[in-house]
């Protein structure tokens, strides 16, 4: 009965989210990843102060607030799939252009097809090579 390491899982970036992340300064990338401490089994009981939950057609997309950035992700078989890494002003600009109230950001986003188009674009992107 020796030491058992925790089960391995991956944080998977698609082509778009990888490009969004790599466009950031290296120190900021490391800081965001250090803040993004989560295991797939924790997705059912996330702290609502740190995580948002956006539902569409039975699918659940999560939002993590890391400083001035928002990481949109979901549970995947291999671990956690990152769909987008956006500066908060990008989301706010989207909300402003959509004429949505800033309160209840997640519910407002879930109701707007343009937001899902942004996420779907990330989902369809191939993982970087």
Descriptions of predicted regions:
Residues 26, 30, 34-38:
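Negatively charged, low-complexity tracts enriched in Asp/Glu with abundant Ser/Thr
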Residues 2-7, 66-70, 74-129:
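Enriched for short, Lys/Arg-rich terminal
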Residues 19-27:
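Surface-exposed, Lys/Arg-rich phosphate-binding patches that contact polyanionic backbones
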Residues 38-65:
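A short, surface-exposed loop/turn module that caps and links secondary-structure elements
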